[in-house]
Amino acid sequence: MHQSLTQQRSSDMSLPDSMGAFNRRKRNSIYVTVTLLIVSVLILTVGLAATTRTQNVTVGGYYPGVILGFGSFLGIIGSNLIENKRQMLVASIVFISFGVIAAFCCAIVDGVFAARHIDLKPLYANRCHYVPKTSQKEAEEVISSSTKNSPSTRVMRNLTQAAREVNCPHLSREFCTPRIRGNTCFCCDLYNCGNRVEITGGYYEYIDVSSCQDIIHLYHLLWSATILNIVGLFLGIITAAVLGGFKDMNPTLPAMNCSVENTHPTVSYYAHPQVTSYNTYYHSPPHLPPYSAYDFQHSSVFPSSPPSGLSDEPQSASPSPSYMWSSSAPPRYSPPYYPPFEKPPPYSP
């Protein structure tokens, strides 16, 4: 009895613990997936802003934001399901795994490009000039009017007044004449007279920008995308691990409560006394006197006669009023005392 009570108490204590562990895992899964979804939205926003900032620089890493965002969305849905929870979480883990790989690659590409191919020194020194978009006729007028001035002044006027062809001074040569499109930020210090092998500062022109300040914004956006991709990389790994540990857990409190309630009526210390009293009621010959009530009747009801007479002539005795049962006498064969398959004891004189 003591052992059964101990087992019952331990099971009752383990049920809230298991349900608490399930709720804790579910809460942690929702927290990490929501956090990953927020980081994915930031990666997508910053990556698209960096990609669309210029026309010729499209290295913003927004692809991991799409993949990680979809995987985290599936994780949020799967964490709130019960029947199809495992399938949804497995799909979420697969997408998050691909998003982690994409975040790693994009972090390297964006970081290397921002560090190696964008030089902000000419921009901070105001040596880069913005060429607005004008018509071809205006550009020809600017070029023709600039021939009357000195070469250095002509270069500056061509750069500031959006000429299609400008002259950039060079150490080994007198001038270089590159062709510049409209809405372009051009840096002569980074343009080595068209020799792409000898370019020392990376990109020398940034097409389709509103001003040269957009290049500084692009630089900051690329580094922001790099940092966010690194954060998404580690957060995706943590999210996949948390979802992997939660996908096989199920709430077991209702089923265990039913089993505990069903086992209470079958406990030994409740059922044993009932069975014992039932058995003692129907099987109690040892607790009764050796003779039944039939043997304790008066001699007027049962006259004394030798047992041999009863055994010799059992059929010769005719019924008479003196041998009839009285109204207060119990029945001759009482089922509670003698079952049908047992023979009653012999009658005593």
From Swiss-Prot:
Topology versus the membrane: Multi-pass membrane protein
Major localisation: membrane
Localization (cell): Membrane
Chain segments annotated as transmembrane: 30-50, 57-77, 89-109, 226-246
GO cellular component: membrane
Keywords: Membrane, Transmembrane, Transmembrane helix
UniProt biased composition (Low complexity): 316-329
Sequence similarity: Belongs to the TMEM255 family.
Protein name: Transmembrane protein 255A
